[in-house]
């Protein structure tokens, strides 16, 4: 399987609609992201349905808890066979290290473990509101460095931070980028956005795209078009 760069965010409150969409696209063209709403509604069985169809799944639950609890949740994700799982880097080094260590018995079959830095909806005023008197980019760099030092595989970050992070943390450190909108797409609720080709040029490894694909009349064609710009 090619290392698909597009991760389609499945944001549905209806499992039948989600699977109807999934059945219109090819597992060779993308991976799928299951977030808090869908997982809370439909649970591990929904992930199994996606696996049955041949898709790799990014379980986007952003675990953030004491090290023992967080690491056990990460292990549960590994047992489910997901391709990627994430934790909040602001949970600290001990939490992230425990989560990494619990995956070691899975060897090459373990999921990628990714840290969440600063949510792409957050601006400087939002950080100030939680007592952080710095620019989003500064906090991203601080948390990304902590994530790497904890031995994780990469971080979720906005495309604007990608080149800076690649330069500081190395080419092997994976960057997963939400806030991606193909040319002409609606900006939605993401504050820091970029087109797919620009994001890859900037250093992003994986691109999270939702509504521009899930709400398209012909999602397979949109995927083909975006993948074409990344070739």
Swiss-Prot record:
Short name of any one Pfam family annotated for the protein: OMPdecase
Keyword annotations of the record: Decarboxylase, Lyase, Pyrimidine biosynthesis
Catalytic residue positions: 62 (proton donor)
GO molecular function, one term: orotidine-5'-phosphate decarboxylase activity
Origin superkingdom: Bacteria
SUPFAM superfamilies found in the cross-reference section: Ribulose-phoshate binding barrel
Chemical reaction(s) catalysed: orotidine 5'-phosphate + H(+) = UMP + CO2
Subunit structure: Homodimer.
Annotated HAMAP family: OMPdecase_type1_B
Protein name: Orotidine 5'-phosphate decarboxylase
Provenance organism: Vibrio atlanticus (strain LGP32)
Underlying gene: pyrF
């Amino acid at each position: 399987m090619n290392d698909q760069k597009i991760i389609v965010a499945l944001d549905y409150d209806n499992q039948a609609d989600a699977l109807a969409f999934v059945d219109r696209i090819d597992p060779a063209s993308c991976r799928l992201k299951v977030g808090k709403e869908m997982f809370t509604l439909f649970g591990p069985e929904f992930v199994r349905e996606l696996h049955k169809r041949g898709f790799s799944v990014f379980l986007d639950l952003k675990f953030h808890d004491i090290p023992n609890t967080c690491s056990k949740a990460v292990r549960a994700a590994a047992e489910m066979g997901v391709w990627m799982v994430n934790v909040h880097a602001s949970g600290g080094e001990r939490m992230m290290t425990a989560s990494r260590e619990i995956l070691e018995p899975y060897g090459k079959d373990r999921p990628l473990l990714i840290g969440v830095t600063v949510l792409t909806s957050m601006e400087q005023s939002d950080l100030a509101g939680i007592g952080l008197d710095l620019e989003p980019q500064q906090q991203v760099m601080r948390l990304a460095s902590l994530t790497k030092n904890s031995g994780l595989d990469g971080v979720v970050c906005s495309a604007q931070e990608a080149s800076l992070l690649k330069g500081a943390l190395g080419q092997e450190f994976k960057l997963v980028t939400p806030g991606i909108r193909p040319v002409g797409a609606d900006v939605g609720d993401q504050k820091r956005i970029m087109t797919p080709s620009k994001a890859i040029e900037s250093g992003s490894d994986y691109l999270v795209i939702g509504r521009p694909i899930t709400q398209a009349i012909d999602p397979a064609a949109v995927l083909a078009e975006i993948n074409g710009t990344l070739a």
